[in-house]
Regions:
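Alpha-helix capping/helix-boundary segments
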Residues: 8-9, 38, 118-119, 137-138
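Alpha-helix N-cap and coil->helix boundary residues
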Residues: 17, 21, 34-37, 95-98, ...
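Structured helix-beta-strand junction loops
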Residues: 28-29, 89, 141
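Short, well-structured N-terminal submotif of metal-dependent ribonuclease cores
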Residues: 1-38, 44-61
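Active-site-proximal, substrate-binding regions of enzyme catalytic domains
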Residues: 19, 39, 43-101
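Histidine- and aromatic-rich ligand-binding microenvironments
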Residues: 3-5, 11, 95-96, 112-114, ...
Length: 151
């Protein structure tokens, strides 16, 4: 089982310098998993970018205002693509690790941002030792190995 991080899914949906590697990861024959933390990040980052492109929002407050006024209906097709990617590839949705000690320890021990610590602790809870990511911060986590994205 390989845990898939936000930046891999994002790079499948949006052209980035990692898109070819991300496609290779998604097409691997391995079982893939992710979590609500990753999907929340993916939806947020994707909609924030789309809102800027479509409505000229330049900051978080403007983004929130646009969503409050327009709702999610202007993004229905985009959201269908995001959620469809997970469903179509049969990426397993894992429950997050709600053990606060695990989360706090991952933050403190590896100097991870809160969401990255949540992802690492979720991998720990589910005994997942491989992560597909373009985030070098996960290289510091001793129970995770970052898979070689060039394969």
């Amino acid at each position: 089982m390989i845990f898939v991080d936000t930046n891999v899914l994002y790079s499948v949906l949006v052209k980035t310098k990692f898109s070819k590697s991300a496609q290779n990861i998604i097409l691997m024959s391995s079982d893939l998993a992710t979590s609500a933390t990753v999907l929340s990040e993916l939806v947020f980052v994707s909609l924030r970018k789309l809102c800027k492109e479509r409505y000229g929002t330049n900051n978080y407050s403007e983004f929130r205002r646009a969503i409050a006024l327009k709702g999610y209906s202007p993004f229905k097709e985009d959201l269908d693509l995001i959620f469809g990617l997970v469903g179509d590839r049969d990426i397993l949705m894992l429950p997050i690790n709600d053990n606060l000690d695990d989360w706090n320890n991952a933050m403190a021990r590896y100097n991870l941002m809160p969401n990255d610590a949540m992802i690492a602790s979720t991998c720990l809870k589910h005994e997942i030792s491989k992560i597909a990511t373009f985030d070098s911060d996960f290289l510091r986590v001793d129970w995770l190995s970052v898979i070689d994205q060039s394969k």
